[in-house]
């Protein structure tokens, strides 16, 4: 995930990370900086996460807006190791920098009681009265896993605009297409799902699924639910029953299944089933 290894050896990035001597995630964030402003921002984030605020405020954005002497000193040390002498820390760069090193800790709210699901599938939680708990999406780089609860406690997090983050970091998103049977309408429906790890970012109708996907989904739906899911007209139902009897009485013929598939596809092409 951090790009530190190539096979069983350190990659070029891994060697840079090791030279910094930081926590691997923080080192990955630091070496990912592409310019001086990103480096200055990453250095300040790292300083805050190494020595988090003790006032109980879990908002990383609030902490970042402060200029604590210890954080400034540590930031300068890290920038010196990176051979960076300029640059300004910029709050608009925090989310994409964090996402590169803590993608598995992107979190989406589940319920109104401060509970979140992380992209890695784990649960996490804030106090229900924490101001951050009003927001649907967070990145939570600092967690505490206790023994009393299956959910980790979020110690420090940043609220994020998920659409903006996806636009700036498209590599975070996996895309999958699904064609499935809709029981309510008796038709096939196709969806495109965008996910970050185990979190669904967006689900949207898929306009033109492949014929193979349609065919397989149709077969799966009929196999699971039976032929009754096809919304037969009275005439078509009578024909189906007659063919069922014919297949029972004349088992040596194999025309029944082929004919049924042909009938269905003709109905589908005429628009009886809509995607």
Model-derived segments and their meaning:
Residues 5-6, 35-120, 131, 136-275:
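Acidic, serine/threonine- and proline-rich low-complexity intrinsically disordered segments
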Residues 6-34, 40-43, 114-116, 122-124:
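Accessory beta->alpha helical hairpin/"wing" motif in late/C-terminal subdomains of nucleic-acid enzymes
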Residues 127-128:
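Short linear motifs in exposed loops
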């Amino acid at each position: 995930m951090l790009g530190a290894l190539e096979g069983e050896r350190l990659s070029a990035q891994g060697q840079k990370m090791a030279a910094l001597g930081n926590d691997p995630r923080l080192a990955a964030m630091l070496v990912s900086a592409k310019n001086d402003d990103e480096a200055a921002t990453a250095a300040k984030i790292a300083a805050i996460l190494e020595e988090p605020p003790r006032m109980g405020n879990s908002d990383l954005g609030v902490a970042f807006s402060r200029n604590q002497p210890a954080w400034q000193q540590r930031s300068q040390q890290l920038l010196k190791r990176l051979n960076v002498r300029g640059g300004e820390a910029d709050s608009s760069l925090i989310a994409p920098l964090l996402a590169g090193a803590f993608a598995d800790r992107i979190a989406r709210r589940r319920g109104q009681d401060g509970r979140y699901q992380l992209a890695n599938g784990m649960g996490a939680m804030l106090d229900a009265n924490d101001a951050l708990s009003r927001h649907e999406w967070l990145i939570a780089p600092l967690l505490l896993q206790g023994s009393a609860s299956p959910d980790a406690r979020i110690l420090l997090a940043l609220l994020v605009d998920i659409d903006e983050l996806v636009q700036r970091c498209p590599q975070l998103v996996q895309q999958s297409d699904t064609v499935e049977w809709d029981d309510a309408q008796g038709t096939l429906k196709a969806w495109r799902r965008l996910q970050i790890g185990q979190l669904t970012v967006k689900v949207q109708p898929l306009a033109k699924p492949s014929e193979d996907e349609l065919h397989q989904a149709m077969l799966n739906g009929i196999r699971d639910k039976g032929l009754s899911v096809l919304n037969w007209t009275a005439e078509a139902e009578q024909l189906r029953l007659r063919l069922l009897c014919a297949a029972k009485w004349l088992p040596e013929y194999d025309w029944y299944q082929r004919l049924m598939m042909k009938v269905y596809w003709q109905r589908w092409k005429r628009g009886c089933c809509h995607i």
